[in-house]
Regions:
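N-terminal beta-hairpin/loop module of FHA
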Residues: 1-35
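Short, conserved secondary-structure segments in the cores of folded domains
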Residues: 11, 17, 32, 51-53, ...
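Generic beta-strand structural signal
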Residues: 14-15, 45, 90
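Structural recognition of beta-strand segments within beta-rich domains
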Residues: 20-23, 51, 80
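Buried hydrophobic-core signal for structured, non-transmembrane domains
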Residues: 41-43
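Short, basic/aromatic beta-hairpin or loop at an interaction surface
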Residues: 50-61
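C-terminal boundary/linker segments immediately following FHA domains
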Residues: 62-90
Length: 90
């Protein structure tokens, strides 16, 4: 669920397989922000785990204030991409 950012606040996105996140209109989750790369990150379902992977973005991806490359998401984790903050719910 997006909890802050320029738009889509309150919008949720189910993770079914792989969810692409970025500025490009080809992503499942589109974040319109100059700090967001065109292909910024993806969330992948592996078994019972959701894995957040930064796709070598220009400005990085943070989970709970820590910059990550790959991270197993837990309920209530806060994901920051550009000026957008999302909260992971399982």
């Amino acid at each position: 669920t997006i909890i802050s950012g320029a738009e889509n606040v309150g919008k949720s996105f189910p993770v079914d397989g792989t969810v692409s996140v970025g500025r490009s209109h080809t992503n499942k989750v589109i974040l319109k922000d100059s700090k967001v790369s065109r292909q910024h990150a993806e969330i992948t379902l592996r078994g019972n785990e959701c894995i957040l992977i930064d796709l070598n973005s220009s400005n990085g991806t943070q989970v709970n204030g820590q910059k990550i490359h790959e991270h197993i998401l837990s309920p209530n984790d806060e994901i920051q991409i550009g000026d957008f903050v999302m909260q992971f719910q399982k």
